[in-house]
Amino acid sequence: MGELNKTKCVSCSEGLPPLAERESEELLKEIPEWVIVSEDGVSRLVRTFTFENFREAMAFAGSVGELAESEQHHPKLVTEWGKVRVEWWTHAVHGLHMNDFVMAARTDELFQEL
């Protein structure tokens, strides 16, 4: 996982450019379970985590929520029976920022700790 999971998010503001595609593809190598998808022209990191039941899925979603609050960087979470889909992107840059890769790595770490 490299060092991404040990990195803290940094504040970013409107008007900053998103990461270049080449940079994103390089960083993606550190979080190989994630994919980059585009929705409405905005790139996002996406991964679906699977669980034995709804209770485990909800507990994981809650843990991701706590992580998001601690970093003030919030994902889209979709929780269903036995799975949680997590999407990270940065609204301020209308795409991917280093923070999204950091949070994806830290989300992976939460999952591994279960």
From Swiss-Prot:
It holds the Pfam family Pterin_4a. One of its GO terms (biological process) is tetrahydrobiopterin biosynthetic process. CDD domains: PCD_DCoH_subfamily_a (cd00913). It comes from the Bacteria. GO terms for molecular function: 4-alpha-hydroxytetrahydrobiopterin dehydratase activity. Keywords: Lyase. Its EC number is 4.2.1.96. It catalyses: (4aS,6R)-4a-hydroxy-L-erythro-5,6,7,8-tetrahydrobiopterin = (6R)-L-erythro-6,7-dihydrobiopterin + H2O. SUPFAM superfamilies: PCD-like. Belongs to the pterin-4-alpha-carbinolamine dehydratase family. This is Putative pterin-4-alpha-carbinolamine dehydratase. It comes from Chlorobium luteolum (strain DSM 273 / BCRC 81028 / 2530).
